[in-house]
């Protein structure tokens, strides 16, 4: 009985940790339990004495502070890693949303389900159905990318007229003031037609003068610039990146010096600016330049501080000395992008966004706005492009036949088709969920990094899959090619607004560990202010959190999450439970990694990357489940849900395993493996059978397939190859029953080619009606249009054709 009572005590302690019961109530429960066993004479009353001695220093706050918290604070202050001003501002900027729940080890799934489903207003829907549809119709991507290297003038005029560049600008300034969800849907639709079109519209509606002015501009700046930006009278760009500072934007060498100078015939307080920027979208044609630079005030004209820090200003590009106009040539996706320079240019101090009082506040301004823009523009462009490619390649795989069958029925093709379908569904779910947070007023900095990374990364891999399936159809550029420009341009999204290698290795977990953790940010703040009381509260909350995560990880590992709470009882129930387990694992290993590695974790980028991978996969899986919930739990969509969640669970577990195999302290890693994987690994990648289901969903018209391509431009217009493929798919499907009947009558399988000739002969023999003959002929025309590739005159492809000189007439000499 004594052994059983000790086991019961250990179970009781574990239950208290598992449910995160506070220290005072836990101490009371343990004392009552011990007293009860002592009263039953199973234990001696003397057992209470050591228990009280252990608990008193923990529950008496003044004693706890002096014995534990104060010494711990001194140690923490000595080992806390140095943090630059830009790092601190990046961490302080923005908010924590759903990713915080996932990081803390016990997600509140009901809270996730209760987040409002984003909806379009009638005005937003009308804009998408009208002006956006028309802009898509006007866009000829081959003309844009190959012939003009720009949008045609009439499309530029249309975008300005319909205020495409003013989606984020408030109505009081003449803007559209659309929601984040509406912006995402607009960009997705445009991206499915032309990457250049989507980038051109997306950038002014992301991080740029419009966004910065609305948040930080003076009233005079707002009233002057915002109406002009809304009308398209001003074309904005924002210059941050320098040749010497790409991903390390805080190291920009561009400078401004506060001084007095002459401006329009008067001596005014201003700045002398010198900059050299590159990769700046819209810079070649911009009329107003948003500029980030490091401002200094050596003469103390603004105050006592000399090095004020990163500052943002608006510079009209007609200002003497401003250099714009040259262009970069990014991967045959020639959107307006180029360098800008200026040397010792004097401008008034009022050019600072927000006026002189915002001098030195530029980095905070940028990271606060970036968390919103990065969560909308790049994920939407990547997702929209893939949604259209998915529809096109699904139709093509059905139409294209080899060895007398549709290539989409071949297992080798089904595998990449499934990845395309699954990733399209997951990416759209992830991009949609973050817009919910933004519409609720959140600025989820960590989540925007997750969505940017995984949408662009998965999008690139999926477009590569589509190119493999398309083969020669995808290789040959021309108006009929629906995949090659997306394939060429995918690295652009990978690179910009935080290169993906940097984002994965440093940002997702680097910021997440501090922002999303329930106690680390408070501990750091207490350490910086040397506040023992605040540190005591955070420290003991942190210790309880670690204990809870360890108990939860071990128990949920033994049961594979089966005892944990879920919001539903259907076939997705187990997914919530398995995510509960992985969330607890992440919480535990994050604390262990920070505790063991300390400040060196900043330099252990592969450890940080794997922890970030776990957090990312938790988000992608939960976004997939949220989408399924928001769309009414359509059972026909379950294969997509199964694939998305199973893939995320498998990748998260793989990251856990890789983390433990490569953890620098092998003893700690071994102990953690016992806690996290008490019965070994349990998750598998999606099965071949599930891949087969997804491949079929992508090829055959259905409500589920329509949801995969929701909101895209699928009209079969002249310059929309995806829309033409969609129409061809319907034509081919309509012809198949007729072809099958004729094959049966012929007693053999007739080839699904030359259907027009088949129709002619069958009609002459009275085997089919005129209507059926017309269907076969139409299907043949659509089939040939779908599988053929573009061809050009030999001289049409050269940018600068070589003019051949007339050959000299050769004279033959007599022998």
From Swiss-Prot:
Active site: 497 (proton acceptor)
Entry keyword Oxidoreductase: yes
InterPro entries hit by this protein: Acyl-CoA_dehydrogenase, Acyl-CoA_Oxase/DH_mid-dom_sf, AcylCo_DH-like_C, AcylCo_DH/oxidase_C, AcylCoA_DH/ox_N, AcylCoA_DH/ox_N_sf, AcylCoA_DH/oxidase_NM_dom_sf, FadE
Catalytic activity: a medium-chain 2,3-saturated fatty acyl-CoA + oxidized [electron-transfer flavoprotein] + H(+) = a medium-chain (2E)-enoyl-CoA + reduced [electron-transfer flavoprotein]; a long-chain 2,3-saturated fatty acyl-CoA + oxidized [electron-transfer flavoprotein] + H(+) = a long-chain (2E)-enoyl-CoA + reduced [electron-transfer flavoprotein]
Cofactor requirements of the protein: FAD
UniProt KW keywords: FAD, Fatty acid metabolism, Flavoprotein, Lipid metabolism, Oxidoreductase
Lipid metabolism is among the record's keywords: yes
GO biological process: fatty acid beta-oxidation using acyl-CoA dehydrogenase
GO molecular function, one term: flavin adenine dinucleotide binding
EC number: 1.3.8.7, 1.3.8.8
Pathway listed: Lipid metabolism; fatty acid beta-oxidation
UniProt-listed Gene3D superfamilies: Acyl-CoA dehydrogenase/oxidase, N-terminal domain, Butyryl-CoA Dehydrogenase, subunit A, domain 2, Butyryl-CoA Dehydrogenase, subunit A, domain 3
SUPFAM superfamilies for the chain: Acyl-CoA dehydrogenase C-terminal domain-like, Acyl-CoA dehydrogenase NM domain-like
Gene Ontology cellular-component annotations: cytoplasm
Family: Belongs to the acyl-CoA dehydrogenase family.
Function in brief: Catalyzes the dehydrogenation of acyl-coenzymes A (acyl-CoAs) to 2-enoyl-CoAs, the first step of the beta-oxidation cycle of fatty acid degradation. Is required for the utilization of medium- and long-chain fatty acids as sole carbon sources for growth.
Protein name: Acyl-coenzyme A dehydrogenase
Biological source species: Yersinia pestis
């Amino acid at each position: 009985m004594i052994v059983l009572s000790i086991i019961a005590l250990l179970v009781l302690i574990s239950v208290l940790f598992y449910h995160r019961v506070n220290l005072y109530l836990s101490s009371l429960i343990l004392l009552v339990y011990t007293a009860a066993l002592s009263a039953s004479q199973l234990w001696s009353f003397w057992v209470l004495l050591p228990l009280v001695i252990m608990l008193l220093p923990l529950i008496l706050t003044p004693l706890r502070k002096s014995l534990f918290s104060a010494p711990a604070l001194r140690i923490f202050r000595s080992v806390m890693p140095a943090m630059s001003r830009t790092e601190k501002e990046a961490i302080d900027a923005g908010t924590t949303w759903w990713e915080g729940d996932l990081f803390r080890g016990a997600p509140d799934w009901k809270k996730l389900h209760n987040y409002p489903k984003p909806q379009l207003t009638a005005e937003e829907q009308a804009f998408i159905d009208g002006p956006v549809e028309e802009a898509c119709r006007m866009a000829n991507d081959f003309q844009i990318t190959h012939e003009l290297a720009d949008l045609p003038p009439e499309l530029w005029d249309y975008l300005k007229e319909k205020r495409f560049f003013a989606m984020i600008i408030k109505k009081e300034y003449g803007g559209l003031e659309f929601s984040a969800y509406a912006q995402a849907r607009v960009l997705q639709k445009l991206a499915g037609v032309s990457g250049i079109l989507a980038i051109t519209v997306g950038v002014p509606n992301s991080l740029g003068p419009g966004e910065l002015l609305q948040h930080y501009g003076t009233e005079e700046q707002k009233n002057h610039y915002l109406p002009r930006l809304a009308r398209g009278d001003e074309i904005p760009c924002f210059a941050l990146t320098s040749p010497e500072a790409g991903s390390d934007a805080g190291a920009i060498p561009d400078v401004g010096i506060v001084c007095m100078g002459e401006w329009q015939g008067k001596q005014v307080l201003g700045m002398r600016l010198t900059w050299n920027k590159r990769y700046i979208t819209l810079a070649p044609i911009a009329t107003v330049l948003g500029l980030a630079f490091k401002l200094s005030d050596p003469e103390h004209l603004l105050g006592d501080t000399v090095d004020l820090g990163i500052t943002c200003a608006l510079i009209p590009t007609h200002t003497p000395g401003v250099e714009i106009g040259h262009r970069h040539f990014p991967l045959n996706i020639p959107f307006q992008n180029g360098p800008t320079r200026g040397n010792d240019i004097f401008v008034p101090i009022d050019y600072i966004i927000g006026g002189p009082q915002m001098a030195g506040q530029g980095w905070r301004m940028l990271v606060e706005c970036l968390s919103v823009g990065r969560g909308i523009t790049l994920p939407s462009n990547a997702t929209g492009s893939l949604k259209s490619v998915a529809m096109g390649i699904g139709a093509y795989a059905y139409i294209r036949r080899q060895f007398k069958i549709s290539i989409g029925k071949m297992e080798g093709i089904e595998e990449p088709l499934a990845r395309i379908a699954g990733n399209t569904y997951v990416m759209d779910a992830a991009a949609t969920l973050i817009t919910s947070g933004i519409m609720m007023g959140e600025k989820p900095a960590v989540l925007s990094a997750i969505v940017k990374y995984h949408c662009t990364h998965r999008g690139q891999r999926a477009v590569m899959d589509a190119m493999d399936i398309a083969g020669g159809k995808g290789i040959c550029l021309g108006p009929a090619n629906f995949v090659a420009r997306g394939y060429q341009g995918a690295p652009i999204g990978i690179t910009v607004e935080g290169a993906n290698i940097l984002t994965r290795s440093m940002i997702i977990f680097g910021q997440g560990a501090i922002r999303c953790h329930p106690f680390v940010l408070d501990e750091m703040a207490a350490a910086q202010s040397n506040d023992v009381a605040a540190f005591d509260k955070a420290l003991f909350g942190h210790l309880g959190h670690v204990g809870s995560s360890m108990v939860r990880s071990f128990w949920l590992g033994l049961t594979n999450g089966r005892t944990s709470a879920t919001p539903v009882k259907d076939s997705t129930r187990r997914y919530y439970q398995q995510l509960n387990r992985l969330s607890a694992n992440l919480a535990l290993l994050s604390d262990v990694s920070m505790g063991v590695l300390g400040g060196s974790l900043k330099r252990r980028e592969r450890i940080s990357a794997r922890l970030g991978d776990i957090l990312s996969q938790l988000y992608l899986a939960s976004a997939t489940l949220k989408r399924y919930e928001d769309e009414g739990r359509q059972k026909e969509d379950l294969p997509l849900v199964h694939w998305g969640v199973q893939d995320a669970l498998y990748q998260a577990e793989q990251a856990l395993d890789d983390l433990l195999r490569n953890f620098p302290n092998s003893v700690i890693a071994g102990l953690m493996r016992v806690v996290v994987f008490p019965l070994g690994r349990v998750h598998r990648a999606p099965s071949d059978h599930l891949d087969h289901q997804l491949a079929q969903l992508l090829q055959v018209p259905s409500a589920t397939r329509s949801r995969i391509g929701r909101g895209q431009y699928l009209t079969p217009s002249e310059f929309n190859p995806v829309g033409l493929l969609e129409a061809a798919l319907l034509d081919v499907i309509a012809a198949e029953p007729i072809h099958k009947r004729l094959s049966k009558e012929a007693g053999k399988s007739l080839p699904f080619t030359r259907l027009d000739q088949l129709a002619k002969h069958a009609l002459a023999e009275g085997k089919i009606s005129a209507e059926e003959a017309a269907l076969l002929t139409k299907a043949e025309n659509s089939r040939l249009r779908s599988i053929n590739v573009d061809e050009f005159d030999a001289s049409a492809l050269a940018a600068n054709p070589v003019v051949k000189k007339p050959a000299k007439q050769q004279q033959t000499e007599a022998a």
